[in-house]
């Protein structure tokens, strides 16, 4: 068992019954020229987050944790995104941006596009699981719950973008399904102003889960090897 120092209190888990969730580390969310950038969100500070996720993934894999990567998006015709009868049609900033800029149609969050791809620095390895998701929560219309339950996994460690949207949505849904969720705050990034990051982390540590950081996580898994991993 491993005890991780976190807020508001430490949490103990078995790494081999824990999954590291990497949420939407796609060009859309982390790279200039991607969806968030084109929609007016600041992605200029995502590079350290990518590096921290690399470090966390390496440590988690060495400890025997399952790594699950998510990619948010839809088919090239956006059928999966929903039409006017879906609130997603009205609230998705990607869909709204494409309606305002028709030349982007088919380029934002479309499966097979550069926007949809994971950033170059983050490459899933054999044994990892890569799943698509059509909405903010990684539990909605995906086999995530079944995958976790069949492996006896009850603890989830979250990284990715955006903290206040897809990361928080997934952790909340996991909480309702009786999963213990931990966010590594320096391996996440918000969509919007910095206060959105702070608010999301406050919500998580106060109501739904725990908050820690990459160095503490790596040190808890293998205190003697963190320097080598970093």
Curated annotation (Swiss-Prot):
Q: What is its EC number?
A: 3.5.1.110
Catalysed transformations (reactions):
(Z)-3-ureidoacrylate + H2O + H(+) = (Z)-3-aminoacrylate + NH4(+) + CO2; (Z)-3-ureidoacrylate + H2O = (Z)-3-aminoacrylate + carbamate + H(+); (Z)-2-methylureidoacrylate + H2O + H(+) = (Z)-2-methylaminoacrylate + NH4(+) + CO2
Q: Which GO terms describe its biological process?
A: nitrogen utilization; uracil catabolic process
Which residues constitute the catalytic centre? 24, 133, 166
Q: Which GO terms describe its molecular function?
A: hydrolase activity, acting on carbon-nitrogen (but not peptide) bonds, in linear amides
Lineage top rank: taxon: Bacteria
Query: What do we know about what induces or represses this protein's expression?
Result: Up-regulated by the nitrogen regulatory protein C (NtrC also called GlnG) and repressed by RutR.
What are the protein's UniProt keywords?
Hydrolase
State the top-level EC class.
hydrolase
Leader peptide range in chain numbering: none
In terms of Pfam families, this protein maps to: Isochorismatase (PF00857)
- Function as written in the Swiss-Prot or TrEMBL entry: Hydrolyzes ureidoacrylate to form aminoacrylate and carbamate. The carbamate hydrolyzes spontaneously, thereby releasing one of the nitrogen atoms of the pyrimidine ring as ammonia and one of its carbon atoms as CO2.
Q: Which family does it belong to?
A: Belongs to the isochorismatase family. RutB subfamily.
Which protein, by its recorded name, is this? Answer: Ureidoacrylate amidohydrolase RutB
Report the source organism.
Escherichia coli O7:K1 (strain IAI39 / ExPEC)
